[in-house]
Amino acid sequence: MIALLADIHGNREAMTACLADAERRVADRYVFLGDLVGYGADPGWVTDRAMEYVARGAIAILGNHDAAAVGKPFAMNPIATAAITWTRGKLEAGQRSFLESLPMAVEEADRLYVHASANEPSRWHYVLDASRAQKSFEIGRAHV
């Protein structure tokens, strides 16, 4: 079983619960589909956990909040911008380096892992209607 974790956004409790559930279900592959940070109170802790899993063979993908947290330009709403500004001050150098190193996409066997669009992994389109939601099915960042 593959455990797909997306949009944790610095939420320690959510990450802990998701990882515990994946372990209970005996996941043999872990994929973090982006947005490890942003909004939540524990961006460093969440990033450290992802780093531990990646060191053991997990995949981690860059999300738009991760990119913004390490200074890559991306237009965000004022609330997200404030959260990212706060997050930047909480991340240590090694955590920032890890986030900076994350790829936009990883292809593995018959799967493509991305945070947003498989057609344009470097663009993060917001899901604003049912049509876009349909196109975004089974990827992170969709928040559907």
Regions found by a protein language model. Name each.
Residues 46-114, 119-140:
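Active-site neighborhood of divalent metal-dependent phosphoester bond hydrolases
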Residues 1-56, 142:
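N-terminal active-site segment of His-dependent metallophosphoesterases
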